[in-house]
Regions:
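Cofactor-binding beta-sheet edge motifs in enzyme active sites
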Residues: 1-150
Length: 150
């Protein structure tokens, strides 16, 4: 008898509550890569996502997020701040294929240049899951996702 075991590498992203192990890591990798492509091309990362998305609901979620977060187009270097603290914004988008749920977020962050400590100062969420049966349950799900993310 031969036994083969595969173990996940220890990462700061735990797949415990996600339906598919590795989902968060894959989404993170995809979104970082999109940010890098947008930066190299000098494009705004949110506009870049909208321009290359062929899904009407996804585009609408990103457009609603841009309005909600008062998104201002930006280019390659968007970090601001003098001294030890840099401030910036990040955007992320995901469509969960199995249930056709669309989520887009913007995070306002501060990064201490000396210590590397990151602090999320504000978080915006646009969410489209279709018909909502239990509004309180959906609100709890979204708020729980934000808490787990930050």
């Amino acid at each position: 008898v031969r036994t083969v075991a595969h173990r996940l590498a220890d990462t700061p992203f735990r797949p415990s509550w996600i339906r598919t192990p590795g989902r968060m890591q894959n989404t993170f990798g995809n979104e970082v890569f999109l940010d890098e492509i947008a930066a190299v091309s000098g494009a705004d990362p949110l506009e870049f996502r909208i321009r290359h998305l062929n899904d009407k609901r996804g585009v609408e979620v990103l457009q609603r997020l841009a309005k909600l977060a008062n998104w201002q187009p930006r280019g390659r270097d968007s970090a601001r701040g003098a001294g030890d603290v840099a401030t910036g914004r990040g955007v992320s988008y995901v469509k969960y294929e199995l249930v056709r749920t669309y989520v887009a977020v913007v995070a306002d962050v501060e990064v201490n240049r000396k210590t590397g400590v990151v602090r999320v100062t504000r978080f915006y969420v646009a969410h489209d899951c279709g018909q909502i049966i239990n509004p309180d349950g959906l609100r709890n799900q979204i708020e729980g996702n934000v808490i787990q993310t930050t």
